[in-house]
């Protein structure tokens, strides 16, 4: 798992523990997901390049640094990734936003694309793919495939919780994709849920169960 970075921080551990609690309601769950994504983004964006700019302080002129966030593309996987996008956009408000919709066929267990709306992608764009739960890796692998087919070269996957099986699936297919997570959990159960995990993130976010 050489491409995996587990962001080890007391704030993340604290907030993630509250999210795992089955008694945490959807409002707090959404807020915590946004906050943790913001903290993950601090590390996941560390490789972004800065350009020198001249600024004038109240006292004198000096050289500062600026990220060209117009070269950043944020792509949540629908639907649970939507809340994560808000966290990154707080830091990079001028980033473009794309959306990818994927579901898993219950018969074949293969990922099926049902929606994709992406801004123009090229070698210079820094793409951040967002999905709270990296479980089997099927959805993430399919989303990366879609991004690459549309011209993306620099892709970073940001997830809340990952299972070893999901990380290995992504690394096996795409060795150039870095993965940032808040926690690496034990394993998947027979139904493809992460153990201990936090349940179905989409259902808990949008109260659909």
Curated annotation (Swiss-Prot):
Catalysed reaction equations from the record: UMP + diphosphate = 5-phospho-alpha-D-ribose 1-diphosphate + uracil
Record EC number: 2.4.2.9
Domain of life of the organism encoding this protein: Bacteria
UniProt pathway annotation: Pyrimidine metabolism; UMP biosynthesis via salvage pathway; UMP from uracil: step 1/1
Single Gene Ontology BP annotation: UMP salvage
Binding, uracil: 194, 199-201
Pfam families tied to this protein: UPRTase (PF14681)
Keywords linked to the UniProt accession: Allosteric enzyme, Glycosyltransferase, GTP-binding, Magnesium, Nucleotide-binding, Transferase
Positions with a binding annotation for 5-phospho-alpha-D-ribose 1-diphosphate: 79, 104, 131-139, 200
SUPFAM superfamilies assigned to the protein according to its UniProt record, in alphabetical order: PRTase-like (SSF53271)
Keyword Glycosyltransferase tagged: yes
MF term (GO), any: uracil phosphoribosyltransferase activity
Cofactor: how bound: Binds 1 Mg(2+) ion per subunit. The magnesium is bound as Mg-PRPP.
Record family assignment: Belongs to the UPRTase family.
Function: Catalyzes the conversion of uracil and 5-phospho-alpha-D-ribose 1-diphosphate (PRPP) to UMP and diphosphate.
HAMAP family given in the database record: Upp_B
Protein name as catalogued: Uracil phosphoribosyltransferase
Native source organism of the sequence: Thermotoga petrophila (strain ATCC BAA-488 / DSM 13995 / JCM 10881 / RKU-1)
């Amino acid at each position: 798992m050489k491409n995996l970075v587990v962001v080890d921080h007391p704030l993340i551990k604290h907030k993630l523990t509250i999210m795992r609690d089955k008694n945490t309601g959807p409002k707090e769950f959404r807020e915590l997901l946004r906050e943790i994504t913001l903290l993950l983004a601090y590390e996941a964006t560390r490789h972004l390049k800065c350009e020198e700019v001249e600024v004038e302080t109240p006292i004198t002129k000096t050289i500062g640094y600026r990220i060209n966030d117009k070269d950043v593309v944020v792509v949540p996987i629908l639907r649970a990734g939507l809340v994560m996008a808000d966290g990154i956009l707080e830091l990079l408000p001028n980033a473009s936003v794309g959306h990818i919709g994927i579901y898993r066929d219950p018969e074949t267990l293969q990922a099926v694309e049902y929606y994709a709306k992406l801004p123009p992608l090229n070698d210079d764009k820094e793409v951040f793919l967002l999905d709270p739960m990296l479980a089997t890796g099927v959805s993430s692998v399919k989303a990366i495939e879609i991004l690459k087919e549309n011209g993306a070269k620099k892709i970073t996957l940001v997830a809340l919780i990952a299972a070893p099986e999901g990380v290995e699936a992504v690394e096996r297919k795409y060795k150039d994709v870095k993965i940032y997570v808040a926690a690496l959990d034990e394993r998947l159960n027979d139904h493809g849920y992460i153990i201990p995990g936090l349940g179905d993130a989409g259902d808990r976010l949008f109260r659909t169960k």
